[in-house]
Amino acid sequence: SPLPLMVGFGGINPAGRASFHHAYRRLVIDKLDQEKQDGTFASLAKLMRLDGNSQDSTVRQYIKDHTLIRKIEIFDPDAVNWHSSATLKNTDAKSITFKIPTKQLPETIPSNWSLTKINDKETQIICEESLSVLLPDERVSKVTSAGQVPSGFDPAALYASRSHPRGLQLTVYGASDAIQSTGFKVEELRNLVRPDEIAVYSGSAMGQLDNDAYGGLLQNPLTGRRPTSKHCALGLPEMPGDFVNAYILGSVGETAGIIGACATFLYNVKRAIDDIRSGNKRVVIVGNSEAPVVPHVIEGYRVMGALAEDEELKALDDSDICDNRRACRPFSSNAGFTCAEASIWLVLMDDQLALESGARILGSVPDVFVHADGYKKSIPGPGIGNYLTVAKAMASAKNLLGEQVLRQGSFMQAHGTG
């Protein structure tokens, strides 16, 4: 059967641009030789729109400080918008009296209100009882660490974004980076096969939850604003794949969005390799985009006890200062994981097409295994499915390469939820 091969990869994450290993080089930049360090810093300086010389030590330190995990910059964690509920009562026996612009009157007037028109623009309200209100407030977030794309990188400025949610902005950049990494132009890649032999499989586990999508849809009515015509559609979790088809590839081939928490990317890769191995597809673009660094998502994960809070990190370090840079410690003493944004994409081909087209072969994806955990008391807790997945993956590698290569010439890349 056809073997699925990787012929391109790319995207954007807190370490920078993924294609050609730029992001990986940022992770190990202190261990690179001088030439590769220079190239990595130059790439990041361009991405971050820095005016200074990337050879300058001050610029290099700025690049280091404003990539990877760090204190949240996307919003101000020291002033998160909030509403505090309150009950207003009169200070004496009199009723509560106030006036507001007439156009701000609610559509449904409370039964304990008496209205008196002052003029064409204002109305006086007399409230016979106590008045329940929401007071605009600001709170300090208990979580201030996140993985964010490099400071200064603005995906919305690179195309006509038209109020697109951040996750979809990252999608356009990430998928474009992956396709260009193949060396083929979009038209060339599309014309290698028949229209129904190319597919895009992608999703977003969280969907788009900022104010330009589901965040605005759900919050605007409670904050005195209206939802827009884009909020509902652009929040759908399969929208990253739709954006690739519509804005980048112009494909009329098959598309799908498979969602599964932190395994969303793997679910879509599995669909891709199954289709290539069966001969149904010859080119598949597969990826995932997540942009969960928004206040209500951070708070949602925090209250379920999933995120590393600042006070807990201070306690781990026995310090009065939260070290945001070291918030993610998946294989060490930790207090929870750290949210991050990213958009990562693969371009897969069957082996025959890759050889015929002269594509640059980066590796193969022979199998993907995903198993449920059976009965368990806690959904997020570890389960037997992990053991089944690893066992089948090792058996597949043994069948392909032999036991000696499996034991002595292979390695396991551990996934630590950080």
Question: Which functions belong to the PLM regions below?
Answer:
Residues 175, 200, 265, 272, ...:
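Conserved small-residue
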Residues 211-215, 268-270, 294-300, 359, ...:
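Short acidic, glycine/serine/threonine-rich loops at helix termini
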Residues 168-228:
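Hydrophobic alpha-helical hairpins/lids featuring a short glycine-rich hinge
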Residues 1-160, 351-365:
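ACP-dependent fatty acid/polyketide chain-elongation machinery
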Residues 45, 122-169, 207-271, 304, ...:
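Conserved catalytic cysteine-centered active-site region
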Residues 170-184, 237, 241, 255-290, ...:
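Active-site-proximal alpha-helical scaffold in enzymes
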Residues 188-199, 255-260, 284-289, 360-369, ...:
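Beta-strand segments within the central parallel beta-sheet cores of soluble alpha/beta enzyme folds
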Residues 2-10, 14, 312-411:
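Condensing-enzyme catalytic core mediating Claisen C-C bond formation in acyl metabolism
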